[in-house]
Amino acid sequence: MENAQTEQSASKTNGLLYSIGEAADLLKVSIPLLRLYEREGLVLPMRKSSRHRLYSASDLNRIRCIREMINDHKVSIEGIKRLLALIPCWKIKGCPEEARNTCKAFTSQMAPCWLETDRSWDCKSAVCRVCPVYENYANCGSLKQTIIECTIESTPRPHDVSA
């Protein structure tokens, strides 16, 4: 399964994969920092059968976004997790209401859906790394736009009162 996941993800990135050392060099960060981001669930690198981490260009963009939030905007790792928890995975995946209401990813605002262990029907067997909820939000701009759109859609509108 891991090899299939790596091959599937590699084909989506045109085969451009970087070891943890190469990724750290490209990003000008330490290897322990990349491991911390993984432990905190902010990035889900691919794994070779040898368990070595592989980072795609999308992973590097995600890490750049994380670094920008931390360094430029002073957002903590917990704050980033809460921002990622705002991604409406149930909407993106089309979860039915009954599944959504029992899913921790819907009812909790503490962490992104890929960190929840009690997930809905569709996500129990899914590989989060290749899920559109995780894949589509590798940069800050798309995350910000989605949060704006969902906030606008869910903002109560005053009822039209006819005289």
Question: How should each PLM-predicted stretch be described?
Answer:
Residues 10-11, 82, 106:
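Generic structural signal for beta-strand residues in well-ordered domains
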Residues 57, 82, 115:
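Phosphate-coordinating loops and pocket residues in cytosolic domains that bind phosphorylated ligands
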Residues 57, 75, 92-95:
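Residue-level signature of transmembrane alpha-helix interfaces in integral membrane proteins
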Residues 162-163:
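Intrinsic disorder/low-complexity detector
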Residues 86-159:
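Cysteine-cluster motifs in flexible loop/terminal segments that predominantly coordinate metals
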Residues 69, 73-87:
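Short amphipathic recognition helices of helix-turn-helix/homeodomain-type DNA-binding modules
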Residues 1-68, 72:
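Basic helix-turn-helix/winged-helix DNA-binding cores
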Residues 42, 57-58, 68-70, 78, ...:
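Surface-exposed beta-strand edges and their flanking turn/coil or helix-capping segments
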